[in-house]
A protein has these predicted regions:
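Single conserved hydrophobic/aromatic residue that forms the stacking wall/gate
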Residues: 1-13
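AAA+/P-loop NTPase substrate/partner-engagement loops
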Residues: 84-103
């Protein structure tokens, strides 16, 4: 199997939540506008130290959701229209926002766990808001209080769904979320 196919199979297996943990939210995302609306609704709930773990196959909408969150957070003039590219090749993109800098991280291309130390993720986890694509690459290093956002396709590969799962105060924070 190709490395890409192996990763897809691995991430697909990790998308299943434990049987004893129901998602806090399970919503349809019928179109890109719904994904953007979810990002705009999630942004005001974020604070320093939050880690949003974005799970999903290639093309599931992880970067689109991260882009919507980043653009929705208060920042310098023009932040709402700022270009927010996928960090697939740069691995990390940072954005000055309120209440904290946002680290948009894509770990898809990480082959060796030793590469993770060079990214400065401990700083991001402590002092910023981290939007993390392909978080399975972190293994045990993913903070326990991260919010897991699982983006999936239906059997036909057309309609999307999102499931949000998190401990700590995430149930309270997400209680009023209405995308």
């Amino acid at each position: 199997l190709s490395i890409r196919r192996q990763r897809q199979m691995c991430i697909r297996d990790s998308l299943d939540m434990p049987a004893d943990s129901a998602p806090l939210l399970d919503l349809p995302l019928p179109d890109p506008a719904a994904t953007e609306a979810l990002g705009r609704a999630l942004a005001p709930l974020l604070r320093v130290g939050d880690v949003i773990a974005l799970y999903g196959d290639l093309g599931a909408g992880k970067t689109a959701l991260a882009r919507a969150v980043i653009r929705a957070l208060p920042g310098p003039e023009g932040a709402a229209e700022e270009e927010v590219p996928s960090p697939t090749f740069t691995l990390v993109q940072t954005y000055e926002r309120d209440p904290a800098p946002v680290w948009h991280v894509d770990l898809y291309r990480i082959e060796d766990p030793s590469e993770l130390r060079e990214l400065g993720l401990s700083e991001a986890f402590a002092e910023g808001i981290t939007l993390l694509e392909w978080p399975d690459r972190l293994g045990d290093e993913l903070p326990a209080d991260a919010l897991s956002v699982v983006l999936t396709f239906d059997a036909a590969g057309k309609a999307r769904r999102v499931r949000l799962q998190g401990g700590g105060d995430w149930p309270r924070r997400l209680a009023g979320l209405r995308p």
